[in-house]
């Protein structure tokens, strides 16, 4: 039987790129590095186990890129997943949340393609941390693209870094792609707490 339910754009695009055969299997030469041209939260929701496995290895960045490219080949997705992974590594190593965010920010702004965008988005987060999560998310963006969802998740975590439940409830109350933002924030808080 063929699945006919909801598929996010990354999954749909990846399946199209795989050109699945009659048995719903990809061709033998498919390298699983041809994900969708998608810049949303798909990989963010499942990257934490990859980071936990490779955090202490020199190959972490390559593994994050490879894991991202399974479902998303968009350069923005790869850049933001590298930032997501670096934040997880900092938190898993015991760095306090605020220091971890600032350390990651320092490297993020050096990204050759997305550095200016990331610098702006980190600044946007810090400028809105005193607003309610609902107000901050409305300004930063409720939608799925990472340039909106990443800062919206981050501001909620910065506001209450030691309160898992409150943070996730405020993310849910802010609407939009709250499930994706909550998955990313939950990974950060899980690594932090």
Give, region by region, the residue ranges found by the protein language model.
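Structured, active/binding-site neighborhoods that engage oxygen-rich ligands
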Residues: 1-193
């Amino acid at each position: 039987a063929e699945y006919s339910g909801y598929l996010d754009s990354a999954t749909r695009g990846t399946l199209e790129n795989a050109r699945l055969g009659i048995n719903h299997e990809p061709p033998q030469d498919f390298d699983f590095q041809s994900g969708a041209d998608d810049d949303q939260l798909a990989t963010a929701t499942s990257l934490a186990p990859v980071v936990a496995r490779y955090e202490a290895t020199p190959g972490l960045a390559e593994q994050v890129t490879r894991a991202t490219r399974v479902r998303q080949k968009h350069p923005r997705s790869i850049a933001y997943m590298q930032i997501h992974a670096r934040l997880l590594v900092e938190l898993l190593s015991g760095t306090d949340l605020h220091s971890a965010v600032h350390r990651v920010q320092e490297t993020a702004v050096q990204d050759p393609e997305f550095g200016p965008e990331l610098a702006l988005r980190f600044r946007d987060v810090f400028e809105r941390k005193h607003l309610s999560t609902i107000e901050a998310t409305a300004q930063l963006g409720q939608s799925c693209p990472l340039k909106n969802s990443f800062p919206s998740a981050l501001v909620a975590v910065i506001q209450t870094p030691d309160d898992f439940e409150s943070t996730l409830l405020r993310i849910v109350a802010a609407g939009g792609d709250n499930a994706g933002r909550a998955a990313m924030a939950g990974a950060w808080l899980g690594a932090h707490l």
